[in-house]
Swiss-Prot record:
Residues 230-239 have a biased composition (Basic and acidic residues). The gene is FANCE. GO terms for biological process: gene expression; homeostasis of number of cells; interstrand cross-link repair; ovarian follicle development. The modification Phosphothreonine is found at T346. The keyword Protease does not apply. As part of the Fanconi anemia (FA) complex functions in DNA cross-links repair. Required for the nuclear accumulation of FANCC and provides a critical bridge between the FA complex and FANCD2. It comes from Homo sapiens (Human). This is Fanconi anemia group E protein. GO terms for cellular component: centrosome; chromatin; chromosome; cytosol; Fanconi anaemia nuclear complex; nucleoplasm; nucleus. The lineage of its organism: Eukaryota, Metazoa, Chordata, Craniata, Vertebrata.
Length: 536
């Protein structure tokens, strides 16, 4: 599908994406890199899809140049103008996935452009530098042979190395004897190369009969059997060979696109993910122009739109989650206006049978996540209606795709918090959906915005088990010293002590008393009074 250079009209109250002025292929790629932990893999899928659709070879030189180009942006509360390159204006998750993708396709990148990008990345003066980005940048610089020689040194922080070693020791109980990465020993490599074909099997037998005498857990044994089965398969095909019709791909000779395997048979990249087909089903490929026309109709607000969902939308049931990702990117769903979003959601909610949970999660992320994170003022009524309607039917997908990312995003502010509070206060929210939301919030690190959303949810008198209530009380009491001046925390405490008075045990009451002791908000007297009502 040839994506037009100009995107669909932006959503109401949403700032344009930093890459909005780039050419269509670059926009599609950067948009795919926004997809959380799977962003790098989705980026590879977009590259392959662009090739199989007959586009020109992806111009990495032009994209790297655009990433380094400085543009004036408004910074700080005083609204001062500063020159800032596009790379540093990208969201943090997009920067991470971009660096991962650059590592994967490094052999096909112009070295001068890559060096410029790495230099820009080093100039990031953020108060909380990202250790993951630093490590990826260091690895890329090593590959290019620039900077101080650090052969044998790890780009990971000492804390990360300790955690990795601990993880390897834990996994080693399964008999795999995992070790943290170390510089290869030339003598060991030479000895390994000279081993006879039967050596590996013998070693495996000796390992199985090791004096440790520990039985391999069933789950780990299943993983091992699966890995052995994978090793017996032919070498993974390149991305080009997976394309329908065998059409030539402009990116066919990129070494990165083939799955690299080490001598131990383990993949350097996620072989399973790369081998997974990212081609759209033939039926959907044929209907792409019609789907684009439907979205255009939604945007233009034409009268007489059919109430029943168009038959073309039934084809969504034929997509796997990865194919749904690709379809959302090609249709530029994140750039729908709020009116178009509401109308599309109306159609999606009327589909029969319902969407699968995994596909509904992908759609939630594509339609809502970027839109919510970009809000600078209160969400429009159209956006709020679309989100609450979608959540009423697909609660689990909305929770998994939105709650965690929005509450943990560094840029979450009043606009995002207000929308989440509206979401958890929905009258149509079933009790089990309330418990689901509560469980997800309890697993997150808490901050000011979390207090507000949690207080709105608990106002609904959520029915929870004693175990879950105990977790809530424990986290609540632990936050007392760190939230002595927080009005949001004080309101949350007041809600818990009044709405859930019958659930609070004597031990929990003592914990609340200690947590409230240093509180300095003007609700202090009300909190003390509520605490007295819990008295023995």
């Amino acid at each position: 599908m040839a994506t037009p250079d100009a995107g669909l009209p932006g959503a109401e109250g949403v700032e344009p994406a930093p890459w909005a002025q780039l050419e269509a292929p670059a926009r599609l790629l950067l948009q795919a890199l926004q997809a959380g932990p799977e962003g790098a893999r989705r980026g590879l899928g977009v590259l392959r899809a662009l090739g199989s659709r007959g586009w020109e070879p992806f111009d990495w030189g032009r994209l790297l140049e655009a990433l380094c180009r400085e543009e004036p942006v408004v910074q700080g509360p005083d609204g001062r103008l500063e020159l800032k390159p596009l790379l540093l204006r990208l969201p943090r998750i997009c920067q991470r996935n971009l660096m991962s993708l650059l590592m994967a396709v490094r052999p096909s990148l112009p070295e001068s452009g890559l060096l410029s990008v790495l230099q820009i990345a080093q100039q990031d003066l953020a108060p909380d530098p990202d250790a993951w980005l630093r490590a990826l940048g260091e690895l890329l610089r090593r590959d290019l042979g620039v900077g101080t020689s650090m052969e044998g040194a790890s780009p990971l922080s000492e804390r990360c190395q300790r955690q990795l070693q601990s993880l390897c020791r834990g996994l080693g109980l399964g008999g795999r004897r995992l070790k943290s990465p170390q510089a290869p020993d030339p003598e060991e490599e030479e000895n390994r190369d000279s081993q006879q074909p039967g050596k590996r099997r013998k070693d495996s037998e000796e390992e199985a009969a090791s004096p440790e005498g520990k039985r391999v857990p069933k789950r780990l044994r299943c993983w091992e059997e699966e890995e052995d089965h994978e090793k017996e398969r032919p070498e993974h095909k390149s991305l080009e060979s997976l394309a329908d019709g065998g059409s030539a791909s402009p990116i066919k000779d990129q070494p990165v696109m083939a799955v690299k395997t080490g001598e131990d048979g383990s993949n350097l990249d996620d072989a399973k993910g790369l081998a997974e087909s990212l081609e759209l089903p033939k039926a959907i490929q044929d209907q792409l122009p019609r789907l684009q026309q439907l979205l255009k109709t939604l945007e233009e607000g034409l009268e007489g739109l059919e109430d029943a969902p168009p038959v073309e939308l039934q084809l969504l049931h034929e997509c796997s989650p990865s194919q749904m990702d690709l379809l959302c990117a090609q249709l530029q769903l994140p750039q729908l206006s709020d009116l178009g979003l509401l109308r599309l959601c109306t159609w999606l909610l009327a589909l029969s049978p319902d969407l699968s949970l995994s596909n509904a999660t992908v759609l939630t992320r594509s339609l809502f996540l970027g839109r919510i994170l970009s809000l600078t003022s209160s969400a429009s009524r159209l956006l709020t209606t679309a989100l609450t309607s979608f959540c009423a039917k697909y609660t689990y997908p909305v929770c998994s795709a939105l709650l965690d990312p929005v509450l943990q995003a560094p840029g979450t502010g009043p606009a995002q918090t207000e929308l989440l509070c509206c979401l958890v206060k929905m009258e149509s929210l079933e009790p089990d959906a309330q418990v689901l939301m509560l469980g997800q919030i309890l697993e997150l690190p808490w901050k000011e915005e979390t207090f507000l959303v949690l207080q709105s949810l608990l106002e609904r008198q959520v029915e929870m088990t004693p175990e879950k209530f105990s977790v809530l009380m424990e986290k609540l009491c632990k936050k007392g010293l760190a939230a002595t001046t927080s009005m949001a925390y004080a309101k949350l405490m007041l809600t818990v002590m009044t709405k859930y008075q019958a659930n609070i045990t004597e031990t929990q009451r003592l914990g609340l008393a200690m947590a409230l002791e240093p509180n300095t908000t003007f609700l202090r007297k009300s909190l003390k009074a509520a605490l007295k009502h819990l008295g023995p």
